[in-house]
Amino acid sequence: MGHRTSIKNPRLTKRLPLEETETVFLNHCRIKNLSPRTIQYYQEDLEYFFAHLDGIRYADEITREVFEDFLIKQINAGKKITSLNTRIRGLRVFFKFCAEREYMEPFAVKLMKEDDTVKEPYTDAEIARLLQKPKTNRWVEWRNWALVNYFVATGNRASTVVNLRVKDIDFEKMTIF
């Protein structure tokens, strides 16, 4: 794709460099009290996107065509649709923010169509094997068995398990808070 020259749109009220736009957006996310992990996700998406923009220095230079060029390059580089959709979700929030602040022209951003993948469920034998108590005194095997049973029983994510503390467990009522 060729180099684009920017023509300032008179309807846009502010012209900000990408780095400054990113800072304003991330501060807005902090003011909204978004989780640090969400803010990190947005920051990583923006930095990845900005690194792949050729000659684009200002937010008002980001157009649907620029975004689609980015996606085509990613597809040609072998990126999976699921990964691209994850990026699109973060960038869509940024684009909407920029359009609301009149830093750039609004444009619709839709997720890419993914082929349905059918994951094979575990067989009854595999589930029984996963839930079977270890036949050893090795601590690691007991830990792994406990974690698998915890995941199966609660459906919690790994990040929840990592942050779980003894004070979060009511052993008498057998409840986790």
Language model regions located:
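Conserved catalytic core of the tyrosine transesterase superfamily
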Residues: 1-177
